[in-house]
């Protein structure tokens, strides 16, 4: 597969972005604007928003995927309604597992919790929908495992140093 994990930010670069975006927002100086950081702002949206919780992706072929970055599905919008697509087994597994991690600096089932994505795809029978370079979920998650381990230490340190204060939003399935 052509996905280049060496293009992911290092844990040092990601930690820098964590601090820099908050500085830009004005929390510690800078301008009074609200910049978003897709990877590090899980605390503001209650973790991963994908899998139909607040968001899904429909690719050019019509496959309804949990996220623009996660190319697995068992539903196509050309064959089922959006409501039916949101009820596909993979999306139901997302809802059952969310939040994927109580540390919202590690919300993603692919980048920070790849073992969970692999389990969900395998258990639901979802198929690769990558139009350019399909790959097995084992291959994809195997490429993300080192990244997840490296980021975990930094993310846990940041989470402990800066306690989660944005508890007003979660909308998770009741467990």
Task: Label each region the model flagged.
Residues 69-175:
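Flexible mid-to-C-terminal extensions adjoining Fe-S/redox cofactors in radical SAM and related proteins
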Residues 1-47, 51, 60-61, 65, ...:
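Radical SAM enzyme [4Fe-4S]-AdoMet core and its adjacent flexible, acidic
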């Amino acid at each position: 597969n052509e996905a280049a994990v060496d293009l992911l930010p290092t844990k040092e670069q990601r930690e820098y972005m964590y601090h820099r975006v908050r500085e830009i927002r004005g929390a510690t100086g800078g301008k009074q604007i609200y910049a978003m950081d897709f990877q590090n702002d899980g605390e503001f949206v209650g973790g991963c928003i994908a899998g139909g919780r607040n968001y899904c992706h429909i690719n050019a072929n019509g496959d309804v995927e949990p996220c623009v970055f996660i190319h697995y599905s068992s539903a196509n919008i050309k064959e089922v309604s959006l409501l039916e697509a949101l009820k596909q087994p993979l999306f139901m597994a997302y809802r059952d597992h969310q939040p994927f991690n109580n540390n919202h600096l590690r919300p993603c089932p692919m980048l920070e919790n790849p073992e969970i994505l692999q389990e969900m795809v395998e258990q639901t029978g979802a198929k690769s929908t990558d139009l350019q370079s399909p790959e097995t979920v084992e291959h994809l998650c195997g490429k993300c495992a080192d990244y997840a381990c490296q980021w975990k230490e930094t993310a846990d340190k940041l989470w402990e140093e800066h306690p989660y204060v944005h508890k007003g939003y979660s909308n998770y399935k009741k467990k």
